[in-house]
Amino acid sequence: EVMESLSPAQNVVKIVLDELIELLGSTESKLVLSNRIPNVIMLVGLQGSGKTTAAVKLAYLLKKQGRSPLLAACDVYRPAAADQLATLGGEIGVPVFRGDGEHPVDIAKGAIQEAVDHLRDVVIVDTAGRLQIDEQMMQEAVDIKKAVKPDQVLMVVDAMTGQDIVNVVSTFAERTDFDGVIISKLDGDARGGGALSVRQVTGKPIKFVSMGEKPDSLEPFYPDRMAKRILGMGDVVGIIEKAQEAADAEQLEAAERMLREGFTMNDMLDQMKAVKKMGGMKGI
């Protein structure tokens, strides 16, 4: 009876939604870490894709989960790249191994030894951004992978990358055989349609999406929510989860009081502060 009550247009939307969810992977693909200490996570991607900020956000997420991460600054080419990572790492209380003046492979290996010496259980290797046509830089990524044998290699992909994303991810998949994808800058105008290409072309799962600039803006990837976003249907569940994280015991008590006594201007101010805590209207 429910299906019969839908209009032809609604039926088409439902069919497209189901197919999109299937294309994007059906279920959440979690980050899998091994029992060895330290675990090593290596990030690769194009120049300007947002690897450094993604590395910091991933470190923050792992720290919240009870891990003790260490960031490795292996980008020796971009001016002040190590300084940027050190600054961002300091803001979230995660140390950064720089290995000033060394080769990226040596820095990555040194970071692992640093983690062993200081009881850090996860090393996140932030590599230099590269072009898929730059053979020397691509080989460097391969060399780093061979040297540190990472548990996970994650490719960071800009959500606003155009149609060339197919060639980009194909090249990286062939050379680095990455394990999963982080979609960055999804808080912009792009709805994430490029994510479809990544999953279809490589068969690699999308692990996380970055929804903003703040350290806590890295979220697990849910195919059903992304499919709804692409179709312009919004992510209601995601908004509810953000509201639950932003709400504290006092706010819950205030909500119960509002139901009993009514809504005041002070209550409106509290609600506006809560929305701001969630990242503002743009973050929602």
PLM regions: where:
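Short beta-strand segments
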Residues: V44-G45, D126, V156, S210
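Primarily NTPase-proximal linker/entry elements flanking Walker-type ATP/GTP-binding cores
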Residues: E1-C74, A81-G101, I107-D117, D121-V125
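Alpha-helical transmembrane segments of polytopic integral membrane proteins
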Residues: D121, V125, A141, M278-M281
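Conserved Walker B
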Residues: V76-Y77, G101, T127-G129, A159-M160, ...
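Conserved phosphate-handling catalytic cores of large alpha/beta enzymes
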Residues: K109-I112, R120, Q132, Q136-K146, ...
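Non-catalytic, charged/low-complexity accessory segments that flank nucleotide-binding cores
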Residues: E1-L23, S29, R36-N39, D100-E102, ...
